Amino acid sequence: MAFSSLLSRSSYIPMDFIIARCRARSTKQKTYAPVCQASTTISSRCSLVGMMQRSPSRSSASSINTMYSAIIPHSVVINLKHANSRSRSSSAVLRASPVCGLTISSTDRIARCTLTCVARSGQMYQISSMPFARRLNRYPDTTS
């Protein structure tokens, strides 16, 4: 399913789908350099850039960091989901104008995320270090 279809039908972008697509295009590497980088246009005004990095870890469970940045044309529900665990997930809704950027950074080891929105005026709103189990706090509406 194309990203444009996902956006136009339900304004919902499944994070695990993006990660899976990113993984499918990646190749095994000996180093812990960025495993995968993917850039996909999901509409004429909205482009999504995704990067997944695998960090060395002493434990058996690897630490995977995912970061996505997008310029979104309208309200979007984004599902934040662990790359290596289906048991924990969270959702965030950002009501924004096309000039508002959204950055999502989540690390499965600590299960936290960061939302950053930059308004046209240059003012930045940020919500960070929020456990997946908690509800997202209210944040400024930049649609006006």
From Swiss-Prot:
Please name the source species.
Answer: Escherichia coli
Q: What is this protein called?
A: Protein D
Q: What else is known?
A: Plasmid Clo DF13 originates from Enterobacter cloacae but is stably maintained and mostly studied in E.coli.
**Alphabetically ordered keywords of this record:** Plasmid
Taxonomy of the source species: Bacteria, Pseudomonadati, Pseudomonadota, Gammaproteobacteria, Enterobacterales
